[in-house]
Every structure is written in structure tokens, then in C-alpha cells.
């Protein structure tokens, strides 16, 4: 597979962040967002093309997993936590 450009990596990062924000559960949503940020930050200085391709493929697989889990989360929604509830004024 050809090496990915910076624009492709940024696009993948944005897709992961956008999809992670769709989790109906606060806990899953914050975990996914934190995990995406930390994963990309951890691998910021990877220069090896093979390693970069491997990481990009893993990120694409993770995007597919997140999309599936978001769909499942919407099908089987649970009661909202205190953090998610609207304040009563």
C-alpha cells in the first residue's frame, strides 16, 4: 500500500473524532475521544512508511468499530447519567 499523505492522516483523525462524538453514552464518548487523541499524539513522530501504513490501517479498522458501536449504542440506549442530564432551572 502506498504511503499516506499528511492530508489523509488528518482526514482520518477528523473522521474518528466526528464519529466518536456520536456515542450516546457519555463514558464511551469521552473514552473514545481521549483514546483517538492519545493514539495520534503518541504516533506523531513516526517516519517509517511501513509503520505508518500499519497505523493507518489500524485507525481505519478502529473507525469501522466505532461506527458499529455507535449504531449498537443507539439501538440499545441506556438511562442517561447525571453528567448527561439537562439541568433543571
Swiss-Prot record:
This is LYR motif-containing protein 4. Required for nuclear and mitochondrial iron-sulfur protein biosynthesis. It is found in: Mitochondrion; Nucleus. Pathway: Cofactor biosynthesis; iron-sulfur cluster biosynthesis. Pfam families: Complex1_LYR. Belongs to the complex I LYR family. Its main location: mitochondrion. Keywords: Mitochondrion, Nucleus. GO terms for cellular component: L-cysteine desulfurase complex; mitochondrion; nucleus. It comes from the Eukaryota. One of its GO terms (biological process) is iron-sulfur cluster assembly. PANTHER family: LYR MOTIF-CONTAINING PROTEIN 4 (PTHR13166:SF7), PROTEIN C6ORF149 (PTHR13166). InterPro entries: Complex1_LYR_dom (IPR008011), Complex1_LYR_LYRM4 (IPR045297), ISC_assembly_LYR (IPR051522).
Amino acid at each position: 500500500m502506498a504511503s499516506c499523505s499528511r492530508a489523509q492522516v488528518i482526514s482520518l483523525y477528523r473522521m474518528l473524532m466526528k464519529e466518536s462524538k456520536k456515542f450516546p453514552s457519555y463514558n464511551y464518548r469521552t473514552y473514545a475521544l481521549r483514546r483517538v487523541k492519545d493514539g495520534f499524539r503518541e504516533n506523531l513522530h513516526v517516519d517509517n512508511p511501513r509503520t505508518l501504513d500499519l497505523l493507518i490501517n489500524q485507525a481505519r479498522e478502529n473507525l469501522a468499530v466505532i461506527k458499529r458501536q455507535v449504531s449498537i449504542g443507539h439501538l440499545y440506549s441506556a438511562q442517561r447519567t447525571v453528567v448527561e442530564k439537562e439541568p433543571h432551572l
